[in-house]
């Protein structure tokens, strides 16, 4: 039986009716003797102080100024005598078994430092969908939800401060809340990461529900709330080196694309651009036997993710990958940031096991907000939720599908994530659809596409076979004709050819130069230069490549550039000497 005592700390600033409801629910649903109740009042003026002064079971601190949330909590924490400390908003009503269930989780392991419940209203992913519309219905919902026999605990990166239960020994080790975040916001994220860096785990008790009215302090002042959020977010980024929202939010939408039949299978999961590891934690919650791997270029975020799995600091586009190592690879909104997503996907594909799967999220370039911004000559970045400053390229749905086909994936499925639109926005969308003569405008409201693409069971693709044939001199003309046809219909491109050539045990420069010559004959001029550049990366003094480059440049009248390549040929023969003579004559 758990005999631990909890110090419950509540801050108040007006809103007496919420405070009364909160404290009455604590008295009703929490056994006497198991808790200490501390209230810190930040100079309320609505009768709250008078009411608190009348309560005999509450230890109250009456501040003579509004010191804000972090400092007020710290005042209460310094007075606490419990084995654990619970930071609780006054706009909360607690429910049957709430504290017992959270304590059961908190003390189930020495590694756990703090726990929190789910609720109906929270700025983050502790919010769940509820089926009630009145408080009376809420009690019935909570009594059914808070089941003592079914623990459902999920390890998390951060907990929201509306209800956070912390071991006293963790507080002693980590310290108090950072008052730099006064009057409030981001202090709970900061404290969560401090707990993590000190070696403690954070757990979300999914089997505990309490009701949260939500933001009574700032809810009536949305502009002030936004200013505070922006200011404290900047403070958080300056302190930690990453964005609390972007780097700590799990991509549950991508994890949901995994095969539920794999729930207890031993698997290797790689998250490229894993940030602080929130998505990897969500994978572990749903697939407990999964081995977790990540790649993250932000070293500060990677240091957090490294507490969760095997994380490498680096750029996912340039890092090397182990062949056939992973069952799933997660790409959350990173393909649009790649310099060469075709080459990247072709490389990553080789790191998948046969039948391995890519789970990707890609912003939709044809979203109505992007089109509207273009028409209004507004910036596409910043406030626009579609794009950020790291975006290098845009993808429509057809381009997304072609990207995966060209990279050698099959069984490519997609799901649209749509946003709600206003009446005015819908009118704009309808006008766009009418303009292009389309009855289907779903792509205009799709914020992003979720992609599930499986590597072909036959890892030896048709392109690899064609390149092998060219290397061996087998039906070269027919093979090149087939490849030119594939280039023209968009099923392959030069980046895919180069990345595939680099994976094969062939004479790479021979094959690249044969293709360059044949593409010239077939008029595929845009695909020649990338092939010749790729060949020079292998050997910058390669005779055939230098000669073919010079010949191509001479044919389009770029003789000065052609001369540069001819001069790099160390031993000229009759053919290169003749070309040099023609180039020099043109330059006279």
Language model regions located:
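Short, acidic, metal-binding catalytic loop of nucleotide-sugar glycosyltransferases
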Residues: 24-34
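A conserved acidic beta->alpha catalytic loop
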Residues: 41-50, 65, 274-277
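Glycine-rich, basic loop-to-helix element that forms the pyrophosphate-binding segment
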Residues: 63-80
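A recurrent flexible, glycine/aromatic-enriched loop bordering the glycosyltransferase active site
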Residues: 70, 126, 134-137, 141-169, ...
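Short aromatic/hydrophobic "clamp" motif used to bind/position activated sugar donors
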Residues: 85
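Conserved donor NDP-sugar-binding/catalytic core segment of glycosyltransferases
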Residues: 96-131, 364
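A short, conserved alpha-helix in the catalytic core of glycosyltransferases
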Residues: 101, 157-175, 180-209
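S-adenosyl-L-methionine-dependent methyltransferase catalytic module, highlighting the catalytic core
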Residues: 126-127, 150, 339-347, 357-478
């Amino acid at each position: 039986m758990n005999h631990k005592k909890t110090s419950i700390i509540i801050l108040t600033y007006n809103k007496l009716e919420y405070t009364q409801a909160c404290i009455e629910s604590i008295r009703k649903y929490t056994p006497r003797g198991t808790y200490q109740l501390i209230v810190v009042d930040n100079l309320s003026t609505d009768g709250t102080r008078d009411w608190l002064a009348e309560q005999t079971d509450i230890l109250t601190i009456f501040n003579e100024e509004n010191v804000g949330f972090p400092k007020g909590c710290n005042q209460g924490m310094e007075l606490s005598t419990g084995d654990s400390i619970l930071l609780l908003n006054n706009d909360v009503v607690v429910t049957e078994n709430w504290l017992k269930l959270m304590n059961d989780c908190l003390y189930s392991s020495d590694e756990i430092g703090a726990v929190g419940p789910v609720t109906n209203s929270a700025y983050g992913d502790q919010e769940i969908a509820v089926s009630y519309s009145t408080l009376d219905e809420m009690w019935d919902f909570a009594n059914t939800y808070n089941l003592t026999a079914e623990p459902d605990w999920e390890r998390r990166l951060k907990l929201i401060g509306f209800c956070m239960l912390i071991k006293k020994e963790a507080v002693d080790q980590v310290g108090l809340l950072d008052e730099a975040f006064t009057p409030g916001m981001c202090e709970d994220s900061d404290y969560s990461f401090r707990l993590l860096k000190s070696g403690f785990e954070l757990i979300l008790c999914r089997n505990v529900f309490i009701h949260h009215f939500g933001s009574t302090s700032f809810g009536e002042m949305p502009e002030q709330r936004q200013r505070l959020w922006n200011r404290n977010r900047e403070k958080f980024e300056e302190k930690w080196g990453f964005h609390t929202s972007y780097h700590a939010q799990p991509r549950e939408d991508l994890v949901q694309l995994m095969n539920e039949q794999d729930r207890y299978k031993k698997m290797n999961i790689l998250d490229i651009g894993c940030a602080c590891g929130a998505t990897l934690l969500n994978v572990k919650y749903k697939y407990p036997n999964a081995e977790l791997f990540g790649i993250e270029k932000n070293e500060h975020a990677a240091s957090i993710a490294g507490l969760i799995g095997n994380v490498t600091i680096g750029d996912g586009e340039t890092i090397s990958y182990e062949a056939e190592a992973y069952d799933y690879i997660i790409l959350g909104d990173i393909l649009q940031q790649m310099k060469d997503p075709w080459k990247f996907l072709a490389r990553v594909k080789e790191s998948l096991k046969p039948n391995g799967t890519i789970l990707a999220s890609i912003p939709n370039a044809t979203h109505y907000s992007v089109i509207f911004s273009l028409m209004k000559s507004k910036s596409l970045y910043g406030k626009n939720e579609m794009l950020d400053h790291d975006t290098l390229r845009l993808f429509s749905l057809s381009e997304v599908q072609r990207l995966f086909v060209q990279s050698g994936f099959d069984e490519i499925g997609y799901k649209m994530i749509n946003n709600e639109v206003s009446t005015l926005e819908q009118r704009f969308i309808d006008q766009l659809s009418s303009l292009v003569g389309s009855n289907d405008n779903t792509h205009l409201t799709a914020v992003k596409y979720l992609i599930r693409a499986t590597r072909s069971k036959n890892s030896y693709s048709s392109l690899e076979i064609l390149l092998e044939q060219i290397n061996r001199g087998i039906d070269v003309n027919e093979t090149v004709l087939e490849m030119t046809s594939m280039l023209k219909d968009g099923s392959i491109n030069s980046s895919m050819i180069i990345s595939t050539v680099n994976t094969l045990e062939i004479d790479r420069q021979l094959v690249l130069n044969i293709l360059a010559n044949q593409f010239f004959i077939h008029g595929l001029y845009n695909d020649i230069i990338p092939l010749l550049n790729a060949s020079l990366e292998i050997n910058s003094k390669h005779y055939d490549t230098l000669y073919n480059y010079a010949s191509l440049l001479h044919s389009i009248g770029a003789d000065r550039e052609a001369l540069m390549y001819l001069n790099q040929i160390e031993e000229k023969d009759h053919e290169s000497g003749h070309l040099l003579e023609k180039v020099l004559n043109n330059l006279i």
